[in-house]
Amino acid sequence: AKTSVSALCQKVGLVFQNPFNQLSGAKETVFEEIAFGLQNFGVPKEEMISRVNEVMELLDIAAYRDRNPFDLSGGQMQRVALAGILAMKPEVIVLDEPTSQLDPAGSEEVFAAVDKLAKSGITIIMVEQKLEKMAEYCDKILLLHQGKQIAFDTPEQIFSREDLKNYGVNPPAYTRICQKFGVKKENGCYPASLREALALKEMFPVEEAFARRKCAAGSAGETSGKPENAENEQIQSEIVDKNVSGTVDCGKNVFNIEHLKFQYLENVPVLQDVNLTIDNRPTAIVGQNGAGKTTLVKLLKGLLKPISGNIYYGGDDIAQKTVAMLAGEIGYVFQNPDDQIFKYHVIDEVMFGPQNIGMTKEQAKEKALQALELVGLKQLADENPYDLELSERKLVAIASVLAMDTKVLILDEPTIAQDWKGRTIIQNIIKDLSKQGKTVIAILHDMDFVAESFERVIVMAHGKVLADGTKEEVFAQKDILEQARIDQPYLTKLCQQLGYEKLYFTLEK
């Protein structure tokens, strides 16, 4: 308590949960933003340049060196914020959900980089919702509940606790599947990571189909990542055919997208000749940071106008409609809730949208209270949204769009900062809206959530659609997933590496 902030910041680096709150806004390029802290410390110019280049390479953001940080995607901004702290080389680094907006490959890179720092002697303290990564990389985990310490132990000890769900924590996917099959280590704990689970491979049940294939195939081709049987080859053929047109035939189309192109900066394409039809199945859009996902849904909402191509909603050209005209039809929840929230009370925030599409004050309040109840925040109706945590502000933003009762709901990274309870709430909302016949489209980096909640998956990379199909079709294509810097869901990956032929997405199946 006696140490000044100026003295402490030279020893302890803090990466905020929300990168928008960390970037200074005083610098016009990524390079200058990362160097900003070093300038304040008086680091010599040559050393400063060396450090900035080093962390940009480490976090794979060198290509954005001369871009304005606020022109980047949320995930790219998160890397820039992290780079600014890593460049200062503090003795202790505190990370508040540093990978919440990163694609799976980006998350792995950050965890690997942080692990390297930890092994070099730097103390790392991390708040995270990605328990599978924590199980793999953390030495100790502190379990908190309502501000009190419940336990401080190794990942396997923490995640093997029978009372874990009482504290709002769902064990990692690998632990859950080991619990289902009764696979335990000699010390009585369940494996918490993929490596630990595979070390006990012989304890898992073996599918008969896999046993026959194993005898026939021997040791050949086990790790090629290519489809290994006729069924998977047929799936690959079908999905490639779909990728030619980017369409899936399933009932009435809600959106028709034709030859869509967009760019923010001249000669820097963001979307390149995108062709899609979107029907009313729950649809997840996945892919690397900067793939053009958020840009695509903003175009669907009418917030941006394409430089060429057309978007039709219900047969009508969106270019002929204003944002106000689409507001009652298409709801959009921003990636960053702070870009959406502006009222001083939660209830007023959630009522704002309904009132602006023609509802009376009484109708708007009724819809707002219903929406707040759906997201579990009715008790916070009179609170200031800015006094809430990021996870709660995200739910407020979702409620404000739910209250408008639109036919289409677009969710940009709905699970950011959400714990197990929040994820479950959002998952139930998606299922309920789908049952009502509404169209739900979501951008996500959480592949397990995608597999559990969505029927259709669209994979994007570098402004193009790489794959478009059912989750079974898409998650069978390891080469496409790799191109898009995403991975199979954790449960799927474990079952695949155990040798199971079928793709499994939930424990129930």
Task: Kindly label every feature range from the protein language model.
Residues I93-D96, L409-D412:
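Catalytic Walker B motif of ABC-type/P-loop ATPase nucleotide-binding domains
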Residues N68-L72, Q76, N384-L388, E392:
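Conserved ABC ATPase signature
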Residues M134-E136, V450-E452:
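A short, surface-exposed alpha-helical micro-motif characterized by mixed small hydrophobic
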Residues E46-Y64, E362-L380:
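Conserved ABC ATPase "signature" region
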Residues Q146-G147, H462-G463:
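Conserved ABC ATPase "signature" C-loop
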Residues A1, L8, G309-D317, L326:
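Conserved ABC transporter NBD signature motif
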Residues K301:
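Helix-to-loop junction immediately C-terminal to a conserved catalytic motif
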